[in-house]
UniProtKB/Swiss-Prot annotation:
Function: Functions in post-Golgi recycling pathways. Acts as a recycling carrier to the cell surface.
Membrane topology value: Multi-pass membrane protein
Listed InterPro entries: SCAMP
Subcellular location: Membrane
This protein's encoding gene: SCAMP3
Protein name per its UniProtKB record: Secretory carrier-associated membrane protein 3
GO cellular component: recycling endosome membrane; trans-Golgi network membrane
Annotated family: Belongs to the SCAMP family.
Subunit field text: Interacts with NEDD4 and NEDD4L and TSG101. Interacts with RNF126.
Transmembrane segments: 171-191, 197-217, 247-267, 277-297
Chain positions found as Phosphotyrosine: 41, 53, 83
Species for this entry: Bos taurus (Bovine)
The keyword Protein transport is assigned to this record: yes
């Protein structure tokens, strides 16, 4: 029987033959550990280590856009905003500076045009009809009226206005120096009675030089620059050269001449120190005026050379001025008529 169960295998072991579950037919239909079905699957049956846990790859998340930084300092309403680069700002600043420069030039040209327009209007209406004398500036109740009309900004070309103004200030300084010289000579006469002649001459100089210097050298210079007159330039050069010599003599201060110069001040220093100091200040003032007078004479001469004036032009202007004078023409006509009548009466 055993032989019949094992299929006639005499070499089979007795245990295996007695185990009914070792039947090949049964083993064939037993579930395998490698191919387990769902109903017989036991998760605790395997002894292999569980696979390591692999987390899913993280999906990259775009960082949130940061809000634009705002300056903690608020711009004032008048403060310009920075809309461009440095080069743009530099070019804008250069353009602005150029525009300002052109605007200033246009303003100067407009002022010059206004001045010329006023000159043309005065010339068209007539100088005597519209221009009233305004110098010297006397009060209205004074019985003496102004003798000259003077307006440097209107009558003198712009390039010569500074020179004419400087000469006007020089004349004013010379007048002030003569007044201080009179006071110094008065003080000197008070401390030293022998200086009476100098005190008397100081009064004469202030009364003589003040009006004569204005009429003899300042007015010719003013008219020369106003109308580009060569004859007035020559009159000015001759008289102002003499005036410069007088300025030097005033600064030297020869005793008895009525000038409180350096020599007179040093002489009085032995008598009274306070009066000598006053005379030294006047001498210093005279010295400054003399230096400025020499400098201005050279400067005006250089301007005269650049204007194209000449001695021949001065002669022509002088001749034209003489023959255009009605009094001169009347005198010349009378002289010619008298000479002709005498010639016909001669035997």
């Amino acid at each position: 029987m055993a032989q019949g169960r094992d299929g006639g295998n005499p070499f089979a072991e007795p245990g295996e033959l007695d185990n009914p579950f070792q039947d090949p037919a049964v083993i064939q239909h037993r579930p395998s550990t490698h191919y387990a079905t769902l109903d017989v699957y036991n998760p605790f049956e395997t002894r292999e280590p569980p696979p390591s846990y692999e987390p899913p790859a993280p999906v990259p998340i775009a960082p949130p856009s940061a809000p634009p930084l705002q300056s903690s300092r608020k711009l004032s309403p008048t403060e310009p905003k920075n809309y461009g680069s440095y080069s743009t700002q530099a070019s804008t600043a250069a353009a602005t500076a150029e525009l300002l420069k052109k605007q200033e030039e246009l303003n100067r040209k407009a002022e010059e045009l206004d001045r010329r327009e006023r000159e043309l209007q005065h010339a068209a209406l007539g100088s005597t009809a519209t221009r009233q004398n305004n110098w010297p500036p006397l009060p209205s109740f004074c019985p003496v009226q102004p003798c000259f009309f003077q307006d440097i900004s209107m009558e003198i070309p712009q390039e010569f206005q500074k020179t004419v103004s400087t000469m006007y200030y020089l004349w004013m300084c010379s007048t002030l120096a003569l007044l201080l010289n009179f006071l110094a000579c008065l003080a000197s006469f008070c401390v030293e009675t022998s200086n009476g002649s100098g005190f008397g001459l100081s009064i004469l100089w202030i009364l003589l030089f003040t009006p004569c210097s204005f009429v003899c050298w300042y007015r010719p210079m003013y008219k020369a620059f106003r109308s580009d007159s060569s004859s007035n330039f020559f009159v000015f050069f001759f008289i102002f050269f003499v005036q410069d010599v007088l300025f030097v003599l005033q600064a030297i201060g020869i005793p008895g001449w009525g000038f409180s110069g350096w020599i007179s001040a040093l002489v009085v220093l032995k008598v009274n120190t306070a009066v000598a100091v006053l005379m030294l200040l006047v001498a210093l003032f005279f010295t400054g005026i003399a230096v400025l007078g020499i400098v201005m004479l050279k400067r005006i001469h250089s301007l005269y050379r650049r204007t194209g004036a000449s001695f021949q032009k001065a002669q022509q202007e002088f001749a034209a001025g003489v023959f255009s004078n009605p009094a001169v023409r009347t005198a010349a006509a009378n002289a010619a008529a008298g000479a002709a009548e005498n010639a016909f009466r001669a035997p």
